[in-house]
Amino acid sequence: FPLALASDFAIDTLCQQPAQWHVLDQASIAPLEFSVGDESAWPGELRRWRRMQSARIIWRDLHEHDDVEASLGAISEMADIALGESVRVLSELFSARYGQVKNANGEVQSFVGFGLGKLGGGELNFSSDVDLVYAYPQQGESDGVRSLDGEAYFTRMGQRLAQLMGDITSDGFSYRVDLRLRPYGNSGRLALSFAAMEHYFQTDGRDWERYAWVKA
């Protein structure tokens, strides 16, 4: 059995999720859907989903259904799906707790996560970090009873996103999130408005930082 010889990870995953063997034969990555209203279940659901979809990619590679480029693209797509669903449920959670952030004209402002590096280039492998930069369109405040200014709101959401993706649980972790490519690196603010980001790159950004955004 080629899979048993090639990947202990894949075999362990199939032993842990025996009802999911059919996933190996699926032509595309299965959607990720978190339990409604149960945030405590999200980390486990994300990690089990990632393990099973990773086993599927390994299976397809071993059986020569996909070449290296297709496999890297699938791994990157898997991360995109995980990030998209995570941002969706966290946006709903924060809206319920703090309301929605609106600018001076009453327009709703949304969380934006830019994928850089191998994620931005569609070249992730199974051991890659996920390089993210957090932003939001314009300054504002949330309209809930527990109001937050836009920067605090989206900073907290970004922190929760990194925890959901990267914290180690009994199911392992899903992705290591690297936020060091943001303006000013580790000393910089976690989430910036578009205007603040533009100002940084026009005044203080270094050439290599601008080049990194080619793959965003």
Locate predicted features.
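A nucleotide- and high-energy phosphate-metabolite-utilizing enzyme signature
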Residues: 1-216
